[in-house]
Amino acid sequence: MHIFINHGFRDYLKDNKKAFDTPINIMEMGLGSGLNALLTAESIDQQVVDYIGIEAHPITEKATYLSLINSLPHALDNQLIESFWDTPWNTPTKITPIFSLEKRHGKIENLELTPSSIDIIYYDAFAPECQPHLWQEDIMRTVLSWLKPGGYLLTYCAKGSFRRTCKSLGCRLESLPGPPGKREISRFVKQSKES
């Protein structure tokens, strides 16, 4: 299973007991094919989830989208796949009775969210070498401002300078085992002001 699901969504539910009808708010940077959103939707049993995914360069051809999704080793529910594709951009849409999705077309530097409104951030941007601006302190200050105290930010990035930036912005680093080919991943937990 995917690191965002196991070390993000599932661990967050274990560590933060919420009523099932109280939404878990998830924001994904780098929505791409929607794999993380689809896996999250498949993973929930009773917990309500409101999911925002931001993508600067969305897939525009349905055939390309289906080819990407169908090439995955994990078979996904066809109705869920169709619902994801059919969801209009920039409009919150109920995909299942307990999973709402808002696909936002745009760049993270233009995204406006309420401070301390997000429980989990899946930071699935390309590596700092490919998109350095997405890993700079000013962007991370904004992104982390959206995270609730105790909230998680997960990323494949284990670069020292990025880790130091997030720690300096009030997050505790948890290094976790990575998937095959990746030694470790980073989970940051936003500390409360009192910590």
Q: Residue ranges of each PLM-predicted region?
A:
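Conserved beta-strand signature within the Rossmann-like core of class I S-adenosyl-L-methionine
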Residues: 150-157
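S-adenosyl-L-methionine
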Residues: 65-114
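A short glycine-rich, Lys/Arg-flanked "PGG" loop and its adjoining helix->strand segment in the class I
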Residues: 134-149
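Class I S-adenosyl-L-methionine
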Residues: 159-195
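Short beta->alpha hinge that forms the Motif I/post-I loop of the SAM-binding pocket
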Residues: 56, 135, 158
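A short SAM/SAH-binding and catalytic strip from SAM-dependent methyltransferases
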Residues: 119-133
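SAM cofactor-binding core of SAM-dependent methyltransferases
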Residues: 7-17, 21-82
